Amino acid sequence: MSDDGEQPGPGDGAARDELSGMDLVRRTLAEARAAARARGQDPGRGFAAGPAPRRVAGRRRSWSGPGPDTRDPQPLGKLTRDLAKKRGWSGHVAEGTVLGQWSRVVGAQIADHATPTALNEGVLSVTAESTAWATQLRIMQSQLLAKIAAAVGNGVVTSLKITGPASPSWRKGPRHIAGRGPRDTYG
């Protein structure tokens, strides 16, 4: 209150100085509610209003039962597979499976001697550790394609490009000139 007997208004800064603790909080809350009403909003009453009324109309809640239900927890693998299918990522995921899980797709023995290097437009490039393994993989090409199709689906890998190890190079340094051609290097 001020000295001349007037009541302080809601915007009066002197009234706030006189109030303390919970009185100040109540006054501030009342001002905020009044401002909300002035803007045409419903200020609400928070927890003082009591619990929200229960829904009477609509479907009653029922338990799942012993059989499978859409509300049952789903395996993470199934959820990610469905997400990839919805977003159109299935092709990219299949390509990543071929390159990332090569040993599981083709088997441990083949994976020990051959490495996938690239997958472009259905052509899988595979580098073998020796020319003998490259020849063996070329012979087994149809079986490899069948294993890959069984693991990731048909159409992901349509053909294989199998290469042996890179041949040795005797070039040294960044610049070179054409030499005399291939010679009998080894004797």
From Swiss-Prot:
Pfam families assigned to the protein according to its UniProt record, in alphabetical order: DciA
Coiled coil regions in record: none
Highest taxon, organism lineage: Bacteria
InterPro entries: DciA-like, UPF0232_actinobac
Disordered: annotated segments: 1-77, 166-187
Bias-annotated ranges (Low complexity): 31-55
Bias (Basic and acidic residues) ranges: 14-30
PANTHER family, sorted: UPF0232 PROTEIN SCO3875 (PTHR36456:SF1)
Family: Belongs to the UPF0232 family.
UniProt name for this protein: UPF0232 protein MMAR_0004
Protein source organism: Mycobacterium marinum (strain ATCC BAA-535 / M)
Source taxonomy: Bacteria, Bacillati, Actinomycetota, Actinomycetes, Mycobacteriales
